Design a protein with these regions (language model features):
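A short, active-site helix/loop in glycosyltransferases that binds the activated sugar's phosphate group
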Residues: 1-18, 25, 60
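Conserved donor-binding/catalytic core segment of Leloir-type glycosyltransferases
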Residues: 17-53, 59
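Conserved active-site histidine-acidic residue motif and adjacent donor-binding/catalytic loop
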Residues: 77-88, 100-105, 109
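Short alpha-helical segment that forms part of, or immediately flanks, the ligand-binding pocket
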Residues: 86, 109-114, 128-129, 133-134
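Acidic donor-binding loop of glycosyltransferase active sites
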Residues: 90-104, 117-118
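Short hydrophobic beta-strand element within catalytic cores of glycosyltransferases
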Residues: 118-125
Length: 220
């Protein structure tokens, strides 16, 4: 389970950040399109549930940044096969995942990472995650408080060096720490009972009560 939903638990559980989120994209070419020579910055947003992902706010923020004069090409895809999502990931500069995430890197951001494309991710967990996740288990993304989403998107638009470096770190993370073989090895340790003490999480330690898909005002 995750520390972000620990408020619903009573017994200690395995922190899933210790295990990882494997993604096998070996069936698709991991080619990359270098768009540095292109005039516009290509941003991809692919919400599975637009309301829960904060899509209306994300689109409003991007429109605001366009109004500032930034050359943005927004690609929004919904209800398309995964092969189409992967195709678009290869052609974008970065992705905007969602606004209310309980993890720095959910599935869409992890797929982007395989292509070396960084993700902007919003979530209330961003400011407290270091209290509940060991540093080596934190996947690289620009994970920010929902109120900071505009500044985060703007940073990846203007700071090309940072954007590319973050994409490289994300790619290294998913190809090593979250590689299917590495995650399977950790699952085998669970099955055999060879469980390190620091994999366990006590729900009594959690102070985070927000949760994915819900604005802070709705939890009060």
């Amino acid at each position: 389970n995750s520390p972000t939903t620990a408020q619903f638990q009573e017994k200690p559980f395995i922190n899933w950040f210790e295990i990882g989120l494997p993604k096998d994209v070996s069936g698709y070419p991991l080619y990359q399109v270098n768009s540095q020579s292109e005039q516009k910055v290509r941003i991809l947003h692919s919400p599975s549930n637009p309301l829960a992902k904060g899509t209306p706010i994300i689109l409003s923020v991007i429109d605001k940044l366009k109004g500032k004069g930034y050359p943005i090409e927004l690609v929004k895809i919904e209800g398309m096969p995964n092969s189409k999502v992967l195709e678009e990931l290869a052609q974008c500069d970065f992705v905007v995942d969602q606004l209310y995430s309980d993890t720095p890197m959910a599935t869409f951001a992890a797929e982007a990472a395989h292509f070396g494309k960084p993700a902007v991710v919003g979530g209330y967990f961003a400011h407290v995650m270091h209290s509940y996740i060991r540093k080596e288990n934190i996947p690289p993304s620009l994970f920010v408080h929902p109120d900071e989403i505009e500044q985060a998107i703007e940073k990846l638009i203007v700071d090309v060096d940072y954007r590319e470096e973050l994409g490289r770190r994300a790619q290294t993370f998913v190809r090593t720490r979250w590689a299917p073989e590495a995650v399977a090895t950790r699952f085998l340790r669970l099955i055999t009972g060879d469980i390190p003490v620091d994999w366990w999480f006590d729900p009594q330690d959690i102070r985070y009560v927000h949760g994915g898909g819900i604005p802070e005002a709705h939890t009060r």
